[in-house]
Amino acid sequence: MDNPLAIFEATKEVSTIEMNAMVVQLQDRLMEMEQVEIVTLHKFLPGIYERTIIIPPWTVLTGAEHRTAYKVRLERGTIAVSTDTDVKILTGPFEFDAPAGFQRAGRVFEDEVVWTDIYENPDNCRNIEELENRLYVVPDIGLYEYRQLVKGELLCQEFGQQQL
């Protein structure tokens, strides 16, 4: 695919394998570009872990594959999001159940997006690294707040990580 953003312009459903390939290709292309700051907030409730990201307008991003099913709460903004076979445009407030096993891509429009993933956390773990390893297939490039591309080298840097 010459244009990795074509994932958001598709007018028909594709196979899960094709969609996954498009998301991975987009991720690879995005890593060649300057990385935008995406603020990540962590909230712990009894038996629940909430991970909120605040995505600036006009951002294109990819997430990690999830190991478990989870709930999504799109608190505000509009985003085009890949599913296993197509792309949906969602506007907050909106909630949905998300299955395990998929890596998603998103394209934010003119307003910032506040997106919260809600996970079961039966042992009330508060160790972010442990939770990430439980919940995600962490890509070699890391997760949102650890990505930064500088002069062709990946550096690990923590951006705006806060705990509520």
Describe these PLM feature segments.
Residues 1-52, 143-164:
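A short, N-terminal "cap"/entry segment at the start of jelly-roll beta-barrel domains
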Residues 78, 103, 112-114:
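Structural motif
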Residues 48-66:
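Conserved short histidine dyad/triad with adjacent acidic residue
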